[in-house]
Amino acid sequence: EGKSFPYVFNIGTGCPWTSLFKKSLIDENKLEFMALSRSNDIYFVNMALVLAKRITMLPEVLVNYRQRSTSLQANNTKTPWDWYEALKAIRDKLKELDLYDTVETSFKNLAFGVNIYNLCSLKVGEAFCEIYERLNSEIFAEFELDDFTEEECYSYNGAKYQIYMQMKECSAVEYLFRQAQEMKEWQ
C-alpha cells in the first residue's frame, strides 16, 4: 500500500503523464486536479500514490520529457505560488486522513524538493527574491523544514540541500551575489 511505503512521495515525478492510475482509485477517493494554472497535478498524483493499494514500477523508459520556452513550467513567474497551494492541500489532506505521521519524512522531502525546485526555476529576479524571502521567513517553518537536517534529506535532494544551507545564512540579494562570485571564480 502507498501509505505503508516510506518513500511513497519520492518514487517518481509529480507528473500524471508518467503514470497510469486505476479509474476505481480515482473514483473511490474523489481525486481531482486542483483549480490551479500550474502545479495542479501535484496534489492528484501524490494523493493517488499514498492512497493506492498497490504501486508497480517499470524499469523501462516510456516517456521522454521535453522543455519548451512556451510551456507553463517555463513561464512560472505568472503564477509563482501554485506549487505552494498544492503542497498545503496535500499536507492538510494527509492530516485529515490521519496519514501524515506515517509518511512525514517522505512528505517533507517532497515539499523540500518542490520548494527549492520552484525557486530555482524562476526567470525573473523580483519573483525569485520574493519567494526566497518567504521560504526563509515562513514557508520552511510551515512545512516543518526550518531545521531540516542532511540526515532527513534523501539523496536525490542533495544539491538542493546545499542551496537550502546557503539560504539559511543570507538574504536573497546576498545569495545571488554569492552565486555571481562563484561564477566569476569558476571562469
Give, region by region, the residue ranges found by the protein language model.
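Catalytic-loop motifs flanking and including active-site residues across diverse enzymes
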Residues: 44, 86, 111
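Membrane-interface aromatic/basic loop that binds lipid-linked glycans or pyrophosphate carriers
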Residues: 125-187
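Short, surface-exposed acidic
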Residues: 100-105, 148-152
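Hydrophobic/aromatic-lined pockets within catalytic cores
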Residues: 53, 95, 120
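A structural signal for short, well-ordered beta-strand segments and their strand-loop junctions
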Residues: 56-58, 103-106
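Catalytic core of nucleotide-sugar-dependent glycosyltransferases
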Residues: 60-69, 74-101, 114-117, 125-145
